[in-house]
Amino acid sequence: MKHFSDQTWRSPQQSAVITYSPAYTLVPTYECFNRCTYCNFRRDPGMDEWLSLSTAQQRLLTVRDRGVCEVLILSGEVHPQSPRRAAWRQRLIELAELALDMGFLPHTNAGPLNRAEMIALQNVNVSLGLMLEQLTPQLQRTVHRAAPSKDPQLRLQQLEQAGELGIPFTTGLLLGIGETSRDRLETLEAIAACHDRWGHIQEVILQPHSPGRQQAIQHPPLAPDELIDCVAIARQVLPTSIAIQVPPNLLTQPQQLADCLGAGARDLGGIVPYDEVNPDYQHHDLDELREALAQQGWQLQPRLPVYPHLVDRLPQRLQTHVAAWLNRFNSQSRSS
């Protein structure tokens, strides 16, 4: 499909363009069988009412005319052996179908999936995501000791499975949870090696641990300089086709965003009304962010939740949805 050529979308590494995804988050359930000590999201299994389709539709109607493109379906994890797992999977599919029917582009992040689950979601999402977090097994004795699905080899297998299936994929590192600099490098190298095999990873999120009021154990925040250093290392390790993302609402120092961009970050992720994972850190006003970046010589532009060079991997039905949004973004760009 020629709409997705490099002539339409310049590589962010070769321009002054900083991208973001105009997004809205739907949470099918906050219940999760993992107990990560730093989590500000989860509720105990059976203690949360699942999101109904009618409620989801009502919420999406409120943002339909606000320029929102991506519907991020971000879910707590129902145990793979739970009798509710099949119903949970079906709710994920139904929410993605609803988003498509209402003119949005869905992206789902719901933890590790078996092959059949991933294929089912592949058919109704323009991309999928899962944070690799850190590959070191040491964290299974500390922050992840009560989080079975944070097994690093299980999560790395998810990246491989997505690659085998040809799914555009987002992954990332959680920084400042007890890992070493060497651990970070090895995690980045593993992502790069997986991408070399399949060419499916579109972006890597570098997310600094940011303490919140709901977490079980208070861990210190990541030092600002460590994030900047990690961005620079990631830009050296990862192929240029993989965008490096930093979440601007988690950058607490005034100069930190500028320094991360200078080190090679080119994407700000989903700008949403409410950060479900980090509820104590809300996003800045988009117009103010755009103006601040412009003063530094950057141009903030919206993007799709699937990167242009990976659109051809999508089912034809999803490519049609993507083409409509790309035409819309291009029209907005020409008129601005």
UniProtKB/Swiss-Prot annotation:
- Regions that span the bilayer: none
**Broadest EC class assigned to this enzyme:** lyase
Any GO MF annotation of the entry: transferase activity, transferring alkyl or aryl (other than methyl) groups
Q: Which Gene3D superfamilies match?
A: Aldolase class I
Name the record gives this protein: 7,8-didemethyl-8-hydroxy-5-deazariboflavin synthase
Q: Name one Pfam family in it.
A: Radical_SAM
Q: Write down the HAMAP family for this protein, in alphabetical order.
A: FO_synth_sub1
Q: Which residues form the Radical SAM core domain?
A: 18-249
Identify the PANTHER family for this entry. Answer: 7,8-DIDEMETHYL-8-HYDROXY-5-DEAZARIBOFLAVIN SYNTHASE, FO SYNTHASE (COFH)
In the UniProt record, the gene name given for this protein reads cofG
